């Protein structure tokens, strides 16, 4: 029977008192003080880098964790069709482009008929050094990892099957020394030259540096006419950053889908990402979550 004037039970009274206390505490201290920060609130682009790597990138490129996180998203879309780039430290695959195995964040290669000066050996040498080798070498790293292979001239010849070799690389995904070696090699082979070329022209923006890095790792930093060096030589001499980058992107678009750099039309869409950000005026890649989502919203072929 329902009695509107009945006395509340003791349990109900305790509940009401507890609720009132909770409400008072929440109003005084805030929900965050009671529960701690939410996972979403605690998440920061800086968390995607070790403190050492983050400081290294800041010192040498002038860009912070948020900017590098966005650069890596833009690079990883055409490389892996995925913005979650941190999953690919242990990536390994023979993509049958005659460049050997493709490895890690920036697609280091072991070498082949179309790549006689690969960057893979540098990565393995850096790993051997990071693990404490007194005289680091690519061969030393292979031995350390139990990989059957050796340097043959400038090419890293792997004798294990793809399943065995890539299985061992995938196990390095969370290896701190491997991650350190990955960023050191990435910087030495591609990032340093890209930053130098930007600064020589008076440019320091994240989009310009990122676009140059993307070009270098995709088409080579120096050497032939399709490399970053070759494209820069054909992009004019404008001191206006936007004007220069529009010219640079136009030149890159002409060659980006040739020579197995990308499968058409993925290359054109790759360049368009950066070019659209230039048009948007989002050169510093700060607070651009929606813009990154927009420019990477294209279908890989």
From Swiss-Prot:
Gene that this polypeptide is encoded by: csn
GO molecular function, one term: chitosanase activity
Record's keyword terms, sorted: Disulfide bond, Glycosidase, Hydrolase, Secreted, Signal
Reaction equations catalysed: Endohydrolysis of beta-(1->4)-linkages between D-glucosamine residues in a partly acetylated chitosan
Function: Aids in the defense against invading fungal pathogens by degrading their cell wall chitosan.
Protein's UniProt keywords contain Secreted: yes
UniProt-listed GO biological process terms: carbohydrate metabolic process
Classification via CDD domains: chitosanase_GH46
Localization (cell): Secreted
Annotated catalytic residues: 79, 97
Disulfide-bond pairs as recorded: 92-166
Name of the featured protein: Chitosanase
Pfam family, one: Glyco_hydro_46
Any one of the GO CC terms: extracellular region
Organism of this sequence: Niallia circulans (Bacillus circulans)
